[in-house]
């Protein structure tokens, strides 16, 4: 989407609901390029790891901290994303890229994600200001109810941080407060076409069910932070490094390949939020 800029209505919707959906945020050509890399890149597969849900089903993901000049790095550094994030976050210090993860829910075996807030994880990293943190999900393939699309509880970002504990290998929100939220606020299934984007607050309660369909669900989730919001228990310094913004056209016009080995991939046993 060339020269994209959020409207005042979208910014207000984010403040009220804790999320916004932007349809056709990426072109079909951009999605085709990203999908080809996702399924064929050695670095992505080599650094992938599984997290078990409560039933033992596995969700596979690859997470990295440092966006480079590869296709995924150029997307996360693109003007359309970073400028949008800058307008949605509280504060005024520079926007930094915390990390990106490629979510890989394979047909029939891709596991669920339990109800949680992203800040439920990041609180353990000792970030202090959840209003200065945001996630941006881009659908690489279609996301629908059948293949375990994201579910959100609208407006729950205003509840503040909910207590979290372990649910399988994941960090899950207190079921009591989830039940209270579901009695009070609407549940929304976030069904996305390839190229659609979801911007959501770090305290928005969300989950996804297992993929029991015949089709894979792939998505990129990039997380951003204001430079002045220090993660005192976060060993990687990416969250304090301002994003070097590139033009939106870079994804298609610059010579790119798969995710670079210098991207700083996470090793599962070193994730502070899982301890």
Where are the regions that the model predicts?
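Non-heme Fe(II)-dependent double-stranded beta-helix
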Residues: 2-17, 22-126, 165, 235, ...
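Non-heme Fe(II)/2-oxoglutarate
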Residues: 44, 48-50, 54, 84, ...
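Short, surface-exposed loop/helix-turn segments at secondary-structure junctions
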Residues: 59, 117-120, 170-184, 216, ...
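Short, charged/polar surface micro-motifs in flexible loops or helix N-caps
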Residues: 81, 107-110, 143-145, 158, ...
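Generic beta-strand structural signal
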Residues: 93-100, 111-113, 132-138, 148, ...
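Short edge-strand/loop segments of extracellular domains
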Residues: 104-107, 153-160, 217, 223-229
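Short, conserved beta-strand element in jelly-roll/cupin
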Residues: 123-145, 191-192, 223-226
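Double-stranded beta-helix
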Residues: 143-205
């Amino acid at each position: 989407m060339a020269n994209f800029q959020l409207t005042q209505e979208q910014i207000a919707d984010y403040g009220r609901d804790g999320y916004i959906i932007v349809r056709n945020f990426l072109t079909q050509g951009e999605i085709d390029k990203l999908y080809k890399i996702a399924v064929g890149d050695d670095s992505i597969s080599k650094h992938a790891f599984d997290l078990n849900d409560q039933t033992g089903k596995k969700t596979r993901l690859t997470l990295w901290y440092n966006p480079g000049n590869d296709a995924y790095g150029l997307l996360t550094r693109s003007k359309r994303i970073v400028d949008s994030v800058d307008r949605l976050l509280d504060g005024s210090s520079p926007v930094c890229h915390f990390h990106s993860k490629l979510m890989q829910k394979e047909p029939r075996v891709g596991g669920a994600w339990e109800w949680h807030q992203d800040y439920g994880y990041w609180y353990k990293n000792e970030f202090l200001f959840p209003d200065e943190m945001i996630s941006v999900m881009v659908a690489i393939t279609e996301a629908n109810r059948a293949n375990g699309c994201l579910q959100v509880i609208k407006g729950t970002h205003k509840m503040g941080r909910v207590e979290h504990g372990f649910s399988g290998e994941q960090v899950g929100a207190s079921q009591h407060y989830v039940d209270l939220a579901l009695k009070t606020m609407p549940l929304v299934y976030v069904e996305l076409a390839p190229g659609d984007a979801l911007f959501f607050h770090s305290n928005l309660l969300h989950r996804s069910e297992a993929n029991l369909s015949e089709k894979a669900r792939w998505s990129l989730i990039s997380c951003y932070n204001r430079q002045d919001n220090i993660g005192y228990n976060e060993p990687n310094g990416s969250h304090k490094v301002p994003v070097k913004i590139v033009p939106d056209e870079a994804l298609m016009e610059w010579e790119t390949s798969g995710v670079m080995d210098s991207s700083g991939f996470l090793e599962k046993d070193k994730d502070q939020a899982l301890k």
